[in-house]
Amino acid sequence: MTCSLDFSWLRWKWRTQDGFSQSPSETTPLLSPETDRQSHNTAEQRVVYPNNSMCHQDWKKVCRRYPGNSICTTKYTLLTFLPQNLFEQFHRWANLYFLFLVILNWMPSMEVFHREITIFPLATVLLIIMVKDGIEDFKRYCFDREMNSASIQIYERKEQRYMLKRWQDVRVGDFVQMQCNEIVPADILLLFSSDPSGVCHLETANLDGETNLKQRRVVKGFSQPEVQFQPEHFHSTIVCEKPNNHLSKFKGYMEHPDQTRTGFGSESLLLRGCTIRNTEVAAGIVIYAGHETKAMLNNSGPRYKRSKIERRINTDIFFCIGLLFLMCLIGAVGHSLWNGTFKEHPPFDVPDADGNFLSLALGGFYMFLTMIILLQVLIPISLYVSIELVKLGQVFLLHNDLDLYDEETDLSIQCRALNITEDLGQIQYIFSDKTGTLTENKMVFRRCTIVGSEYCHQENAKRLEMPKELDSDGEEWTQYQCLSFPPRWAQGSTTMRSQGGAQPLRRCHSARVPIQSHCRQRSVGRWETSQPPVAFSSSIEKDVTPDKNLLSKVRDAALWLETSDTRPAKPSHSTTASIADFFLALTICNSVMVSTTTEPRKRVTTPPANKALGTSLEKIQQLFQRLKLLSLSQSFSSTAPSDTDLGESLGPNLPTIDSDEKDDTSVCSGDCSTDGGYRSSTWEQGDILGSESGTSLEEGLEAPTLSQDEPELCYEAESPDEAALVHAARAYSFTLVSRTPEQVTVRLPQGICLTFDLLFTLGFDSVRKRMSVVVRHPLTDEIIVYTKGADSVIMDLLEDPACESNIDVEKKLKRIRARTQKHLDLYARDGLRTLCIAKKVVDEEDFQRWASFRREAEASLDNREELLMETAQHLENHLTLLGATGIEDRLQEGVPDTIAALREAGIQLWVLTGDKQETAVNIAYSCKLLDQTDTVYSINTENQETCESILNCTLEDIKRFHEPQQPARKLCGHRIPPKMPSVNSGAMAPEIGLVIDGKTLNAIFQGKLENKFLELTQYCRSVLCCRSTPLQKSMIVKLVRDKLSVMTLSIGDGANDVSMIQAADIGIGISGQEGMQAVMSSDFAIARFSHLKKLLLVHGHWCYSRLARMVVYYFYKNVCYVNLLFWYQFFCGFSGSTMIDYWQMIFFNLFFTSLPPIIFGVLDKDVSAETLLALPELYKSGQNSECYNLPTFWVSMADAFYQSLICFFIPYLTYRGSDIDVFTFGTPINTISLTTILLHQAMEMKTWTVLHGLVLLGSFLMYFVVSLIYNATCVTCNSPTNPYWVMERQLSDPTFYLICLLTPVVALLPRYFLLSLQGTYGKSLISKAQKIDKLPIDKRNLEIQNWRSKQRPAPASASASASAPATGTVHTRPPCHPVPPEAQQNFGASTSKSSGPPRQKHVEDRVLQDPRCSREHSRDDTCTVDTLAKLSSGECLLDPNRTVAPTAYSRGQKDVSRHSSKGSHRRSQSSLTI
């Protein structure tokens, strides 16, 4: 991808160096005007002709060949149901195996059972599955019939009007008209919308689960709402891509009769299954119909994964097959030897029709096949059916666990993959996203920096310290927090827009522009009179308390902006102009949709209920009390000077920003601390409106009075970052009023409405990492590009054209850039998400040239994405930096506790995030992924040789203090240490953490350094991958999963996590605020990260333990029962006969012993949930497969052989010498084996309930009831033998009772003795936990506390720090790294109050840096590492040129100035920080 972009950029530069002088045919062959209208490549493109009178013949030739809109999701018809269903069922190996045995049994020479008897089990299974498939298919048929019969208005060519027809009558090329609330019947290209702005609102919940509305706009050139769309006047040909399943990707162009082309994309495509909302009428032409629609192409079945236990079962099945082969071979050889003892043919041997007898060899071969029929149950085919039933029961229990239900979102766990529940108990590695997974993804605006001046928003930080108190005071308070300016305007309403020049301004009370509403009213048991909930608009996110100093400057900027068309503008780099552009960028540069609360989404809602009068009076009283506090506190507020330029004074105690010797400027009010007052616990209400606003109590009440008629605006955004920035701008009265595909309207603080022409929108993508909008300013008529994006990208695109002619401006911009970068580092270390805001003014001529190429790129089909990327990159350069924002994404509740528990469970946790390194590191400390006692290695490099050298040096350094605790594992020829290393000396070495970025990952993957990287990670307690792309995330997961052969789990909430989720053994999606892509691609979906704790530690452990022990029991049960028939062959001449009735053998597995294992697999609990949560280390039993592995399998097989010997030979010795018949001998054996197997099951059960007892007792009693009825009624059911009255006679024989009591005791005695030893002297964690569970609650809690104190000894660093000097413990450094003396100075003087944890004194920080880390160093291609510097406590060199402590920021610090030339950004540096 990188190579293709580089080549495209070179081609673009070559193409544009002559000033866009090429013609369209020279630049893009696809867009050549000489292209013939009919020369379309139908093999790679789809050509759609309209179904009207003009193009009907072309439509018949081309479009009639496309599939219709009728869907058929059924698998069968009445004629094909029986043969097709049988054909599908016999694709299963188990059914083929049984069919093979039935065919063998039908051969006269190998008939063991009656033919009807052998058919019965197979026919029963086939019939049950056939009925199930038939019912499911009939339901699909009913659904298809309902969908196909739905009505829609289709344009009829002959009648020349829309007529009501069925969905199944829709064809490609038809014109379809839809009303509000109708479902889109096919994939339709939007050609008309009744919305004045040419927009159609869609609800895509049926398609992707997202509830916020989407906008689709009419194809360019057709947006004329005042003119009704006439299909007969549409003569264009549509060329688009072939049908595919990409919901968000679509490209094509419309070729008009004059051979001009208009491009379109997914923004104009209405997908089948979506619902039209808030749009009266929408019309379009059908592009894809029926099974070719994107919705149908995405309608795949549930994902299938094979669990680890299932793979283990398949291996053991082969062992059983080998055992079956051996037993059959013994039977065949024994049969031949038995017959060989007769001198002549045995008297019971029957000749064939010709009088010939079988030879001994042929008779032995037939006996081999006969023994396969006889011992067929040795292969536990029914085990797979039991496993499916058990997993259904486990999923049911998961769904009904209230602890996995989130009340706030009204979501519970979803199990999308039903066959891997047991894998939840064997996870060894977890790969987690950060944003929305560890954090809430509820973005809160915290701080900002504008042209080098930092505004800490102290009052906003104080307000966020007590969100609960704010929420309880009602919604009325929120509307006052953005009323920072008094109403200065007269009556009247105006929207200001440029139509070739600026028009006079008119004042307005409010912005009354046409707004299409699409907010929703959600029912929560009562009618909410406040603003209904919308996406990313909780009270914490919407309410922003403005900074006092910035508030006054914003007012000046708004006044300057208002009069910028009547007087000469200030210099382009003035603070006032930059502030105005900054807030305009926050308001405009997004994709936020605007609606009003007075026009809810068109659905049937419940009428409002009357609210109690007392509640309203209380709210009014609270409101007046708050406003009184406001008016009192404002009298004590100080007035901050208003900056008009960068060099003006910023305050009496603050340095000027033009001074080279001073540090960056932080414009904070009052006694603002360096962290923005995050730790403040009080809130001065008077700081909300600002000291200079001059708003008295009466004015504060007047403002909302003037705008009572104005509908409350609400915003819906696809990204929470965008919503946070829009609400922040609104807090400063830069309000986004409306947005259409063509225009965006912003209301200024004075009430003036500016309507910008929205020329182009360059959406965000993961490659560019930014988005831009191109607008025309309504006052200056300038074309402006507003860009926002990651600082790692924006900083490299800054190059103001004014710097070429003005050296002073260049110096000033460099200082702004340097100080902004320092503020960004501060925000990142405080755990804030950062975005840079920039702008660019484009000449009209240059823009027109660029726009022509952009339109060509939009209209192309070949390399469309590449061409769009080229045009965007060409425009987004030479930017002017406006400022940056810091947005807080709070940790979810319970995340630190969950991570700590998962760690104690032996799970390795990696965080893979696209955020910048400093932000991710701070969040890692906050969520306890990294501890202040850890030694953290931070590797940043782009060069492969340097990366290899750093990895080698790091490994050498780590190995001096760590050595493998267990035997190393092989990894592709290399020795890999275990993940829990120990220490050479008696003292415990600090834990290791690794931080790595995306550039380094590229070097690792491209340089074949995966093995070294994995070897390093095995020593690390935590691994943090920053700036990683979705592809890199999936590559890391696959690398660890395949190379280390471990069980992996990926968890995320966004579309960028889909590849990572799909690559892991288990993928978990979080139902967050970034859509449902992650959930739809996951195996399990949860609402919060903290649910992962119980999901894995409790349900995961239970699911694995239950299923594993049930599988082992199934193998034991079948082998034990089959061996009874095998031992009998030694006493019947290996004839293949049985001493048990055939029907009794069938009933044994079908009824008598089938239900207890299923109940055991669903409900058994070896350890209680409370103990599992209190002792997470119990989870390791599943990781080590203690319940089901090769030793446990063979121990169970040996036990089965022993018990079968006892169950056969004790009755044999008892009845030896008697004259009983075969069934009288076999009935006690059958009864004893059933009793032994059920008692064995009872001994394995760890939890006893009434249901367990009823099932076991019921199975035992069922055996006697069925046997008594069968033996009394079935006289000739199994001729020539006669089981008549056998059980009745046995029940009157005391010997029967004696052996039925004695034999199971002898058979189960060894297992009972072994279980007793394990329970008394067992050293396993599970055995100890089971003992604790049996204690009373008080003693149990005390034992758990003692266990935790033993398992978690005090860190060795605590004792080491007592004897260590204040500067910290010094580790022996590798001899290959000299330490320069200047690197050992102490920079840790400042203190920290930020949310990140403080670094303790015994922590050692070291840095390895590459010579290429700054422009002053020579660019060296060698992989040597120059420096290993040991720093004092509190330091963390996040890059080689910076020495700022990780959690502290002081204006008094002197940092090394940053080289600001292009290409010197720290992304190009190579460093290793420890």
Swiss-Prot record:
Q: Which residues cross the membrane?
A: 93-113, 116-136, 317-337, 361-381, 1120-1140, 1143-1163, 1193-1213, 1220-1240, 1250-1270, 1295-1315
Its name, as the record gives it, is Phospholipid-transporting ATPase VB
Q: What is its EC number?
A: 7.6.2.1
- Source species, please? Mus musculus
User: What cofactor(s) does the depicted protein rely on?
Assistant: Mg(2+)
Listed A to Z, the keywords are: ATP-binding, Endoplasmic reticulum, Endosome, Lysosome, Magnesium, Membrane, Metal-binding, Nucleotide-binding, Translocase, Transmembrane, Transmembrane helix
* Tissue specificity comment: Expressed in cortical neuron (at protein level).
The UniProt entry's GO biological process terms, in alphabetical order, are: lysosomal membrane organization
Name the catalytic site residues: D433
